[in-house]
């Protein structure tokens, strides 16, 4: 694991963008798994403003998604459309989402079908070239939540913890989602390279725990210590 220590979020976003730009230029056909939320947001926007960068041939794969939202605009898919696919000028057929259409997944049964469908897409397309990840306040990775045991290796429907249900992304939902869809451990560990972005003062405590290098399902992001090619970029 390589570590890039940054002084603040602005520097972190710049360093992360430069990291990703180098790899896009090396392989314009890269298959990229993308996280949402505040951690990678400015990195995505920096890349959209980069001149002479061909992003049109990239493929995007969604990392996770809420289940049971009342508004599409609160979804991870909406975020990816707004902040990545459209600004990066990537054709819609090269964006692989859990939901078959621009609508929220409204039930656990529908979400389970979507998980199976995404797993088949990943099996067909091969491992991700790059996977962009952040860490939740409780140490989650995607929607792989802290637990006593590791979950399914494949894409699955996760029961969300209260910490995740309080995420700013869904703060205007009257009822927080009970479930989330997420890529599984297999897709994470099979990714050729991982960009791990850790930022936010509220994550200092869990980041300190993560640095102990104890791999445990109680801190899902600890699984990254088993991956051979992780680039950590942090301002903590």
What role is predicted for each listed range?
Residues 1-32, 49, 95, 112:
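N-terminal glycine-/serine-/threonine-rich phosphate-binding loop
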Residues 34-39, 133-137, 199:
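Glycine-rich beta-strand-to-loop/alpha-helix junction loops that act as flexible
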Residues 46-55, 78, 146-155, 213-215:
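A glycine- and small-aliphatic-rich helix-loop capping segment at beta-alpha/alpha-beta transitions
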Residues 50-59, 88-90, 187-191, 224-227:
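Short, conserved loop/helix-junction motifs that constitute active-site signature segments
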Residues 55-132:
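Ligand-binding beta-strand-loop-alpha-helix segment within the catalytic cores
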Residues 141-185:
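Class I SAM-dependent methyltransferase SAM-binding "motif I" and its flanking Rossmann-like core
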Residues 183-186, 190-236:
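ATP/nucleoside-binding phosphotransfer catalytic cores, i.e., glycine-rich phosphate-binding loops
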């Amino acid at each position: 694991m390589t570590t890039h220590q940054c002084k603040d979020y602005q520097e972190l976003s710049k360093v992360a963008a430069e990291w990703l730009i180098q790899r896009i230029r090396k392989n314009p056909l890269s298959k990229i798994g993308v996280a949402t939320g505040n951690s990678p947001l400015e990195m995505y926007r920096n890349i959209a403003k980069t001149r002479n960068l061909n992003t049109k041939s990239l493929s995007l794969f969604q990392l996770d998604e809420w289940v049971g939202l009342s508004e599409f605009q609160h979804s991870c898919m909406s975020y990816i459309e707004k902040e990545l696919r459209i600004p990066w000028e990537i054709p819609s057929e090269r964006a692989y989402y859990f939901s078959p259409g621009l609508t929220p997944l409204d039930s656990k049964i529908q979400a389970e079908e979507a998980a199976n469908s995404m797993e088949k897409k990943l099996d067909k397309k091969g491992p991700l070239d790059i996977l962009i990840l952040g860490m939740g306040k409780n140490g989650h990775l995607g929607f792989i939540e802290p637990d006593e045991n590791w979950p399914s290796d494949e894409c699955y429907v996760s029961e969300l913890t209260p910490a995740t249900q309080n995420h700013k992304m869904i703060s205007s939902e009257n009822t927080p989602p009970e479930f989330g869809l997420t890529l599984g451990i297999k897709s994470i560990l099979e990714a050729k390279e991982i960009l791990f972005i850790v930022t936010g003062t509220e994550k200092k405590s869990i980041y300190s725990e993560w640095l102990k290098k104890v791999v445990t399902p109680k801190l899902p992001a600890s699984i990254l210590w088993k991956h051979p090619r992780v680039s950590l970029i942090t301002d903590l």
